[in-house]
Amino acid sequence: MSDFENKNPNNVLGGHKATLHNPNVSEEAKEHSKKVLENAGEAYDESSSGKTTTDDGDKNPGNVAGGYKATLNNPKVSDEAKEHAKKKLDGLE
C-alpha cells in the first residue's frame, strides 16, 4: 500500500518531515520517513527548519513589485510603509 493512496501528497510529505523533527519518534520511524521523502524526490535536510534543500530562496520579481504596489494602494497602510514601498519599487525599475 502506498503512503499516498487516497491522501493529499503534500500532507503526507509534511507528516514525514514532522516525524524527522519529533523527539518522541523512534529511529525506525525516522528512517522510514527519510526513505519516503527520498523516494518522493524531496531533498530534505534535517538541520533546516522544515525547508527542502531545493528551495533557493529566490523571489519572483513580479510578485514582489505587486506586493509593493498593493501596499501603496492600501488605505490601512501607514504613510511610512507606503514611502518604503515606493522606494523599493523605484529600485526595482
Curated annotation (Swiss-Prot):
The lineage of its organism: Eukaryota, Fungi, Dikarya, Ascomycota, Pezizomycotina. Keywords: Conidiation, Differentiation, Repeat, Sporulation. GO terms for biological process: conidium formation; sporulation resulting in formation of a cellular spore. Belongs to the UPF0654 (con-6) family. It comes from the Eukaryota. Sequence repeats lie at residues 7-37, 59-89. Pfam families: Con-6 (PF10346). The keyword Ion transport does not apply. This is Conidiation-specific protein 6. Residues 27-37, 77-93 have a biased composition (Basic and acidic residues). Signal peptide: none annotated. May protect dormant spores from desiccation and play a significant role in the formation or survival of microconidia and ascospores. Residues 1-93 are annotated as: Disordered. InterPro entries: Conidiation-specific_6, UPF0654_domain. Residues 7-89 are annotated as: 2 X 30 AA approximate repeats. The keyword Repeat applies. One of its GO terms (cellular component) is cytoplasm.
